[in-house]
Amino acid sequence: GDHRDLHLSIRRQRQMCIRDSVYTPGHTSNHMCFALQEQKALFTGDHVMGWSTSIVSPPDGDMSDYLDSLELLLQRDDQVYWPTHGPCIDEPKAHVRAFIQHRQEREQQIIDCIEQGIFKIGEMVPAMYHDTPEFMYPAAARSVLAAMDNLVKKNRVIVVSGSGLEGEYQLSAS
């Protein structure tokens, strides 16, 4: 049957046996997804949500791990995702690819900001999230920090002074 049959089955049984766990660090360092292999269904928790990308907030969240975990999910054969937040995801591979592309676009926005002379995360957030309500800027800053940490790991950006949200960043010479 399709995923609606799975939903009805879970509602009627109220419990199920899951034998396959998938370690997906990134959103948090210990995040796990759980699979029902026979149904090709994956319970994605907060790693892949149905309505938005997950926040990745250092130090427990790590963007490099998050992206690696998304790539891992692309290698799986799941036909439906059941996230903790949002509707079920009927086209998981397309959804995951869109999340990866979104994170790559955010990294490019950071590089664009630095090229325009914006070197601090607090100043990048309004430029990058101009369509986001201001009360969400602190969460957005945590996400920018995670992307910045990933750019530093990849040696595309260097820390000039300070650290974290208070740091000043520039493009790497290499």
Place the predicted regions along the sequence by residue.
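Conserved acidic
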Residues: D2, L6, H95, M136
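Residue-level signal for the nucleotide or nucleotide-sugar donor/cofactor binding architecture
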Residues: D5, G61, A139
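Metallo-beta-lactamase
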Residues: S21-E107
